[in-house]
């Protein structure tokens, strides 16, 4: 009979809490059978006891007890079967990225519902899914997940994983997660309340914050078969559960069977570990070196830049503070100095103002005198110009007078000639008229008689005319010639008389002109006087003329004499003025020459004395200045040496700190260096010994680390060649307790090779070339080998083996067994510990060696750079002493300068007095000349007389010289001149009358023959007419000639007369100008002599020079006054400025003192003052320090960009007004660096020492890297052998798995198996790796690529037809190092008449596919357990459970096969089946979903042991 139990639940909500009412609880008819545990090699397998769902949809608080084998959930559609399984899977794999609960109709889909099937299966509030398990250690563990819906459109669910341990087996899981609040009500506890409840009952509650930790706990406690380290492992596990849940052959699993069935590289990876791990360690070492370098560089960079940044600002502030103090003191000194200068300037202003007033008054006087001198000079110049004009005009007038006289004579001659020519012309005109009349009369006659008659008549007329003119009544033709001769003689006598009168007239005219000229000259000189007194006046003038002429000639000498006297007088006045000035300046009253000469001698002596004293002081000052320059040069030399000396001292101090020694002399440094060399040699020997020991241990570890336990790699090649397996590999799984027995059992043959046929191998032994000295071969089946081949007896300390009938071998149990992986691993652990100890000792000794080397290097650098300076005296102390000496010298120099200034003032005063005396002494004789003024007056009177005579001579000298030769003509006045002139006129008239009579008589004489025509005069008429005509023509020609002569003489007379008029006009104008000039020069009132201009100019220049000197002095004084006034303003401003600067500087000093005190307090309290007070920076300028600080600031901004705290601290420190923030930043950096120091490597808190130790550590790591590089010499052949061994072992394991699947049958499927094959491309790769082709060795000898990359490149070489895609060589190489990529796995089934064929869903029925898929999943789980056996506790066998939803597709036989499979493989199975399915075995739950009002719940009835028997 079966036991029946039923539990009904109703759910209702009260006050927002989920309440449970138990309406009907039926007691279980027969109590559940106790949960039994099956054993696995003596270890019981863990089991899932129950599944508890709290507040799921339809299940408020339901616990499903799970059967040991099969638990069936039976019910209709929507009853809750899938929900129950979803709760189980959620508790098993609580990963929302994987969970996707779809029904079988959406199998293979990737989308599904939006909430992936979980959100809709939960109710609002807190939900739980809990698995109750009991593991191989009989520990009860409750693992589960708290679920809660998250409000929102995305239908998200929040998961919290937890575990509970220590709960009694009798405790119901439902009671743990709910709290009863009434007889029929309960509420769900939240996670915190659950934690409190579990802790109250004494159990352990643990919540997990990652799925990896949750699964790690489940693996450690034996709940899941495999450690799920990553999301990929969880995905595989979920795919396996999903494939199990939905049934069938999962393509996701079959496509990647290698990943599920084959374990990760254990053999190959372990073999490859020797090289790849070494590479990895090398890379880690490189990374460590990089990290160390980065830390070291960071430390160096931060310390250097921070020190530069803060120390430069610290020293700049210190310099500025010192500079501000000095500036304040300097401002105060300038303030006091400006006040003293102001007082001195005020006194000087008063003195200069008084002098300026005196100079102004003197200048006004000099200006008046100078203007007078200028005016006098102008008058003299005007007078000289007038005198020059007078002289020129006098000369011109004299010349004009002579020319005028000459011109008058010429005009008179021309006039006489003109009158004579006119008279002749008129006579010729009369004769022409007479001839014309005769000719006219002749022409009137018609014939010759008439003409003769006319001629006769004309002759009579001419006779009558002659009678009339001559007054001769008796004149006739006969006596006409006599009368003509008489009258002609009378005419000649009259002509002689006229000529005589003309001669007398010319003589009279000459006498008269001389008299008139002399009279005019006398009147010109003496004025208008009677003609009678002219001779007396002329005689008086001529008598005085020689004395006046002589006096006039003496005028220049008198002028020169007067000029010399006036100069002497001017010198006398100048000397008087100099004497007065000298007395005034010297405050003396010296008057006599003796007194002046004595004082002159005193001043010369004084000047010599002062000059001697001054030269002595100059020499002393020069000596002091030379001494000061020497001190300055010495100071500069020490100032140049000071930074280097300070740097050397800092280096020496660091060396003393590093070495712990104190060095007083350079020889101490050299001795210490020698001792360090000795110590370094000793430590190097210890290091080499430890290195040798470490290498031996590494060799043993490497030999024991072989996966098959072979110590000789040649054995692997021989085993592969013979087709056998190493004996050590067969006993690889032997326990550590049995390891001594088996090691002694086989003795020397523990490294034998197990082969199937010794005879086949014996033939190959002769061909062996490279093999161990002793090679043991044992015949047997490697897949089923045991120790029955040997006859052995175990003793207390060893084993006796019957080798043959006549040979026994006794082998003692080894103290350190190495047979079997467990023994080797134990020995490896011991060797690893020993190696770690040796490595630690080696590292310490190597560190000490490096430390010695670094210390010696530092000492060498110190010797090379600083030894010459480090032990010299302190330059700063010398500089202080030099400063004191320089200050003393400066004080002495100031005293010398003051004394020298006073001496120079005395010397200048003495020289000025001496200069005045030198000017005054040569003029002493002038001062004593008392009658100088009288002589000047006398000379001036003589000069006035002489100048008057000179003026008279200059004015009338020419006139007197003209008068002197003709003065005698004045003695008699020519009074008969007019009578003679009348007589001459009368004689000329008579001459004209006589000549007319002569002409008339001559006409009658010429016509005398005409008288004969009285009777017959007609015959000669024509001849007479012709003669008349000829005569008329002659007379006309003569008239024309005379007319031309008259015209010429008229023009000549006009020209001469015009010249005369011009001369007269010029004479009159110049004479008038001369009179005007004489009047003007008389009005000027000055003497225009030759020296007048020179004297006037000299006087003017002297006054101008005096005025200029006075003006210059006054200008200088006024400039000095202006300068003093401006300087007074400047001094006032300077006083205010210096006072303000002093107060400002004092405020700065006071204000900076507060901040400086804070800086000092911070630096001293943090022990940073010594690092900040870098004295060598004190010798840099503020700009250089600021530039250093700015550069360091820029570098620090980059360095601390990733550190928020330091970045903020640096930003705050940039405020220049608060230098203490920079010190705080410095402290923060040091604190940060102290925190960054790796205490496991560096044993110091000081970052400076940390840098040193980092250097040492870096050298050690570099040496270690070099050593490890030598270990990377693994060959490609060994890798290929290990890979083949691993593949062979896995093939054997797959064959063992196939044995468990041989008897499985589902429908027509009678058997299932796995087929393992090696890929052709990878087989070629293995052949290439194990071959001896030199063409491939270049890849593995290249140090620039890793072994993985070399593998990838080799794979590409031998398979050029395969496209590698975008994958890198490293990725491909890593895949090639995984032996699973060399294998192809396929699932085959033996189905009916088809025989063995590939297992595919299309070739199998649904039930066959489900069964086949379940078989594959069981194989995977079994493989996982085997793979994880080493990393799992030896007393743990994990739970084994699979799912199957919708089991209706399986027939009863198939279900029975599943039950059998579960029983045979010790597996639990959870299936879901329709209502009509009732398995014979296991536990079955009937699920019915009921609805009551608006509430629904699932009614569950559990059946155990239900089934029918045939």
From Swiss-Prot:
Residues reported to bind ATP: 75-82
Protein function: Plays a central role in chromosome condensation, segregation and cell cycle progression. Functions as a homodimer, which is essential for chromosome partition. Involved in negative DNA supercoiling in vivo, and by this means organize and compact chromosomes. May achieve or facilitate chromosome segregation by condensation DNA from both sides of a centrally located replisome during cell division.
GO molecular function: ATP binding; DNA binding
SUPFAM superfamilies, sorted: P-loop containing nucleoside triphosphate hydrolases
Membership in a protein family: Belongs to the SMC family. MukB subfamily.
Key words of the record: ATP-binding, Cell cycle, Cell division, Chromosome partition, Coiled coil, Cytoplasm, DNA condensation, DNA-binding, Nucleotide-binding
GO cellular component, one term: nucleoid
Xref: InterPro entries: MukB, MukB/SMC, MukB_hinge, MukB_hinge_sf, MukB_N_dom, P-loop_NTPase
Gene3D superfamilies: 1.20.58.850, 3.40.1140.10, Immunoglobulin FC, subunit C, MukB, hinge domain
Domain of life: Bacteria
The protein's assembly and partners: Homodimerization via its hinge domain. Binds to DNA via its C-terminal region. Interacts, and probably forms a ternary complex, with MukE and MukF via its C-terminal region. The complex formation is stimulated by calcium or magnesium. Interacts with tubulin-related protein FtsZ.
GO biological process terms held by the UniProt record: cell division; chromosome condensation; chromosome segregation; DNA replication
Compartments it resides in: Cytoplasm, Nucleoid
Coiled coil regions in record: 6-30, 346-506, 553-633, 673-706, 821-847, 876-1064, 1094-1149, 1249-1305
Protein's recorded name: Chromosome partition protein MukB
PANTHER family, sorted: CHROMOSOME PARTITION PROTEIN MUKB, DUF4476 DOMAIN-CONTAINING PROTEIN
Organism: Haemophilus influenzae (strain 86-028NP)
